Amino acid sequence: MKSLQKGFTLIELMIVVAIIGILAAFAIPAYNDYIARTQVSEGVSLADGLKIRIADNLQDGDCTTKGDASTGEVGNEDKGKYALATIEGTPAANLSELKAEEKNGCLVKIEYGKGTSGGSVSALINNTELVLAQLANGSYVKESATVKDKFLPKALKETK
């Protein structure tokens, strides 16, 4: 009577381990890129929240507010978990004459690694920045960046 084989041979187990290792070699860098992209997106969301403040400030003739954040007034920055977004710039002299796609002079500087979580930001974007220029219609275009383009949202990659 023949005995039946029970379990796996050593070579079969080694092949499975090799396949898992190859898959992990591709999956881990892709996952790290995904994490960096989501953290960059948080900074862009912070910039979107500053649009209203910029519009209010422009009513007073400046991009930034003179308010004192320590007294409860809304300041020129917004801090998220991974990034700090700050309003900067000087409004264009002919603000009322600008076309919708022209820059109004106001900038939002997003600094990654300066959020509330501090060191938990991805190493791929830590200590980098993204500067967005606001258009007259309120939307943003990329002005400059030390963040790699592959981490930027698609809408920002297609501009400038």
Curated annotation (Swiss-Prot):
Compartments in which it is found: Fimbrium; Membrane
Cysteine disulfide links:
C63-C106
Ordered alphabetically, the record's keywords are: Disulfide bond, Fimbrium, Membrane, Methylation, Transmembrane, Transmembrane helix
Superkingdom of source: Bacteria
Q: Which residues form the propeptide?
A: 1-7
Q: Name one GO biological process term.
A: cell adhesion
Does the record carry Disulfide bond as a key word?
yes
Question: What residue intervals traverse the membrane?
Answer: 8-28
Q: Which residues carry this modification: N-methylphenylalanine?
A: F8
Pfam families to which the protein is assigned, alphabetical = N_methyl, Pilin
Protein's membrane topology? Single-pass membrane protein
* Record has Membrane as a keyword: yes
GO terms for CC?
A: membrane; pilus
* Family the UniProt entry places it in: Belongs to the N-Me-Phe pilin family.
Its quaternary organisation is: The pili are polar flexible filaments of about 5.4 nanometers diameter and 2.5 micrometers average length; they consist of only a single polypeptide chain arranged in a helical configuration of five subunits per turn in the assembled pilus.
What does the UniProt record say this protein does?
Major component of the type IV fimbriae that plays an essential role in twitching motility, natural transformation, and protease secretion.
Which protein are we looking at?
Answer: Type IV major fimbrial protein FimA
Which organism is this protein's natural source? Dichelobacter nodosus (Bacteroides nodosus)
Recorded name of the encoding gene: fimA
